[in-house]
């Protein structure tokens, strides 16, 4: 399957895994803050995405919106699961497919899900400072592609 193929490509790329783990080390210092930043960047970059999150209420309220906070935290733990599974194709497929189900249920297409790469790039840049580089963005984009293949 396409999912297995892409998951295998990520798991077998030592350089990308190093970049993912190193950058995750930075992103995960403040799980909630990073999750909220990523969501805010998504809504800025892709205003149409706001409509997909109508159930969360006023997303411009940021941290004051408990539903948005909850989603941001859950999102970060999903990323943690992906990073923890980088050495095991079957495990990576399992956690990605579980994550994908939530998005399939909300009718998020693979293309729509792919819109997260730009906001993720902005978030990485803000969090990593001088350590930021495009190879790190590419590594995360490879992981996003595994999710897209599951949608």
UniProtKB/Swiss-Prot annotation:
Superkingdom, taxonomy of origin: Eukaryota
CDD domains xrefs: Mb-like
Protein residues bound to heme b: 103
Entries under Gene3D superfamilies matching the protein: Globins
A Pfam family the protein falls into: Globin
Annotated signal sequence range: none
This protein's record includes keyword Acetylation: yes
Example GO molecular function: heme binding
N-acetylserine, modified sites: 1
Domain Globin: from-to ranges: 11-151
Keywords noted in UniProt: Acetylation, Heme, Iron, Metal-binding, Oxygen transport, Transport
Subunit relationships: Heterotetramer of two alpha chains and two beta chains.
Family as reported in the entry's similarity comment: Belongs to the globin family.
Protein's name according to its UniProt entry: Globin-2 B chain
Source organism of this protein record: Anadara inaequivalvis (Inequivalve ark)
């Amino acid at each position: 399957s396409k999912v297995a193929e892409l998951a295998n490509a990520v798991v077998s790329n030592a350089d990308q895994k190093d970049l993912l783990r190193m950058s995750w080390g930075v992103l995960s210092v403040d799980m909630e803050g990073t999750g909220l930043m990523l969501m805010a960047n998504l809504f800025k970059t892709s205003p149409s995405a706001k409509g997909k999150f109508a159930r969360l209420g006023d997303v411009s309220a940021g941290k004051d919106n408990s539903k948005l906070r909850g989603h941001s935290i859950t999102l970060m733990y999903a990323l943690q699961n992906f990073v923890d599974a980088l050495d095991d194709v079957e495990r990576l497929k399992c956690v990605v497919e579980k994550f994908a189900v939530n998005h399939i249920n909300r009718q998020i297409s693979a293309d729509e899900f792919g819109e997260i790469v730009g906001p993720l790039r902005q978030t990485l840049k803000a969090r990593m400072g001088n350590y930021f580089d495009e190879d790190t963005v590419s590594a995360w984009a490879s992981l996003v592609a595994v999710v897209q293949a599951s949608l």
